[in-house]
Regions:
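Solvent-exposed adhesion/ligand-recognition segments of exported proteins
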Residues: 1-166
C-alpha cells in the first residue's frame, strides 16, 4: 500500500514514544540507544517515518520479525543512526528517500545484550536475504552500510563527511 507504515512495535531496550499522524509514524527516542522489534517495517511511497533522536550518535536498532523483506518506498528521516535489520532482506525502491545521520541495513542480527554493552557487532543468522537500493540514501556525518549475503546498489548513496560500506 502507498501509505504502509511499520506495525507492531515492541520496545525491548531504551525508551521512546511512537505515534502515528495520518501517513507519518513518529518515533521520539528518549534514550541514547533504542531497540525495537517490529512485526513489519514497510514504508509506502506516500508515507514517512521520522526518528527524532537525542543526538547524532544516538542509535535506533529496528529488528523486523516479518517473513518478507522490508519494502522502503517512501521517506525515512532521522537525525541519528538507524539500524534496519530484517533477515529476509531490505529493499529501498526508486521512490525511497532516506535522510539520516547514519544507516545500517542488514539481514544480520544484533542482540540487546550486545547493545547494552555498547557492542554493535552484527551476527550472521544464516539467512540469505538481500539488501537492495534503487532509491536515494543520504547520511549526514555517519556511515551507510548495506550488509547481506547479496547487496545490490542501483540507486544513489551519499555520505556527507561519512563513509559508505557495501
Amino acid at each position: 500500500a502507498n501509505t504502509a507504515l511499520p506495525t507492531g512495535a515492541n520496545i525491548t531496550q531504551g525508551s521512546a514514544q511512537i505515534s502515528q499522524n495520518n501517513n507519518s509514524l513518529n518515533i521520539n527516542q528518549n534514550s541514547q540507544n533504542l531497540s525495537t522489534n517490529w512485526n513489519t517495517f514497510n514504508i509506502g511511497k506516500d508515507a514517512t517515518v521520522n526518528f527524532n533522536q537525542p543526538n547524532q550518535s544516538a542509535i535506533a536498532v529496528n529488528r523486523v520479525l516479518d517473513n518478507n523483506a522490508s519494502q522502503i518506498m517512501g521517506k525515512l528521516n532521522a537525525n541519528g543512526q538507524v539500524f534496519l535489520l530484517n533477515p529476509n532482506g531490505v529493499i529501498f525502491s526508486k521512490t525511497a528517500q532516506v535522510n539520516v545521520g547514519g544507516l545500517v541495513a542488514s539481514t544480520l542480527n544484533l542482540s540487546d545484550n550486545d547493545i547494552a554493552q555498547g557492542k554493535f557487532t552484527l551476527k550472521n543468522n544464516g539467512n540469505a536475504g538481500s539488501v537492495e537500493n534503487y532509491g536515494a540514501i543520504i547520511a549526514n556525518g555517519g556511515v551507510v552500510a548495506l550488509i547481506a549475503p547479496t547487496v545490490k546498489n542501483h540507486g544513489t548513496i551519499q555520505a556527507n563527511n561519512g563513509v559508505v560500506h557495501l
